[in-house]
């Protein structure tokens, strides 16, 4: 019975994910309205060399779910760096990895960039991007980044915890998210790259306390949820620095 259920997932999954994804759009849509402009010099009053930081990705980077720009993931992470950060955020809500290649990389700033952070894959998981296609396009992103920049690759969050998705979408989306996440983890196994296990480090907390950690759309993280993401990123980067 278990084997039959596993075999049935790809067959049923396409129809269920498509139908349930449309049903999930019934709730409040926090992506409407003018997106946040997150570009800024963060911590300008701090001592030290300015770090040039670029973020690529989807709505989680664009600040959807955050109550204001300063509580968005890139701003909060930059504020905790302990030195000035020249922050550029190219992310767009709804983006898949192909959008990063086609629309965000062409806008990548010229000049020296110290750190690039990427959070992409959740939309690819829900919209059934093939793992091989995702890997190919993600490699294109990595190959286009400036030599010498530190690359921080955020994994796919625990989509199976999203309250807005009814079952069986939660389960199926979680499986798909894990597949895409494994690709990111593998690609991060190279010098100068750091993988952040967002699902593993934050997923259990989101499942325990969805009312606090999800925003009002029951889909994106809230301010408190993004704080957990920031902690996961900071800890992974610190651990990577200790190993190098």
Which role fits each region the language model picked out?
Residues 1-54, 234, 238-244:
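N-terminal secretory targeting modules
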Residues 52-54, 62-137:
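Conserved SGNH/GDSL esterase-like catalytic core that processes O-acyl groups on lipids
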Residues 89-91, 155, 197-200:
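Residue-level recognition of beta-strand->loop/alpha-helix junctions
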Residues 119, 154-155:
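Alpha/beta-hydrolase-fold catalytic nucleophile elbow
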Residues 136, 140-144, 179-186:
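Alpha-helical scaffolding segments of alpha/beta enzyme cores, especially the outer helices
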Residues 147-150:
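A short helix->loop->beta-strand "cap" motif at the edges of active sites that frequently abuts
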Residues 160-244:
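Catalytic His-Asp segment of secreted/periplasmic serine-dependent ester chemistry enzymes
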């Amino acid at each position: 019975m278990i084997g039959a259920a596993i075999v049935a997932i790809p067959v049923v999954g396409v129809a269920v994910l498509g139908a349930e994804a449309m049903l999930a759009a019934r709730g409040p849509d926090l992506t409407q309205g003018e997106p946040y402009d997150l570009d800024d010099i963060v911590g300008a009053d701090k001592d030290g060399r300015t770090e040039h930081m670029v973020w690529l990705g989807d709505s989680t980077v664009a600040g959807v779910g955050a109550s204001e720009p300063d509580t968005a993931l890139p701003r909060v992470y930059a504020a905790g760096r302990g030195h000035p950060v020249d922050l550029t955020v190219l992310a767009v809500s709804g983006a898949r990895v192909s959008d990063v290649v086609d629309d965000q990389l062409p806008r990548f700033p010229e000049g020296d960039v110290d750190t690039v952070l990427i959070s992409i894959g959740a939309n690819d998981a829900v919209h059934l991007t093939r793992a091989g296609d995702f890997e190919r396009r993600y490699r294109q992103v990595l190959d286009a980044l400036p030599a010498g920049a530190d690359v921080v690759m955020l994994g796919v969050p625990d989509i199976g915890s999203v309250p807005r998705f009814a079952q069986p979408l939660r389960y199926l989306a979680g499986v798909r998210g894990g597949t895409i996440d494994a690709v990111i983890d593998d690609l991060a196994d190279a010098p100068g790259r750091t993988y952040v296990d967002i699902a593993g480090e934050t997923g259990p907390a989101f499942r325990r306390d969805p009312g606090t950690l999800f925003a009002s759309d029951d889909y994106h993280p809230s301010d408190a949820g993004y704080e957990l993401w920031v902690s996961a990123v900071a800890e992974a980067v610190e651990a990577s620095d200790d190993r190098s």
